[in-house]
Amino acid sequence: MEETKDGWVPDTTLFCFDRNRNIFVGAVNIRHYLNDKLLKTGGHIGDGVRPSERKKGYATAMIGLALNECKRLGINKVLICCDKDNIGSAKSIINNGGILENEVEENGHIEQRYWIQL
């Protein structure tokens, strides 16, 4: 696979929708491989949950589904990063087997880097 000229890599986006309440809950993006920038900060998976739906387990579930898709794509070791201050994201990553490797600082911002072996 080849990186595009603008630095983007191929990706897959999955959406979480609550059919019972007819609302969009969140989304998770899976980057098929990492370029140098994503290896430092960003990682394979990024997710977002609607503010009104946070702290309900959706992020943990979405990351779990994304990890299944990573396995299907042949990604055996997955990097997921989050803001050091985002305790909820860190818990969702850890609940899916994430192991903190380190923290990196970029432009005054500290990001935690977690790896998950599939």
Language-model features: where?
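A short, internal acetyl-CoA/4′-phosphopantetheine-binding micro-motif in the GNAT/acyltransferase core
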Residues: 17, 32, 44-55, 83
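Conserved acetyl-CoA-binding loop-helix of GNAT-fold acetyltransferases
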Residues: 46-49, 55-72, 91-95
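Conserved GNAT acetyl-CoA-binding A-motif
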Residues: 70-81
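Conserved beta-strand-loop-alpha-helix junction that forms the acyl-donor binding cleft
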Residues: 80-88
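Conserved catalytic-core motifs of GNAT/GCN5-like acyltransferases
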Residues: 81-82, 94-113
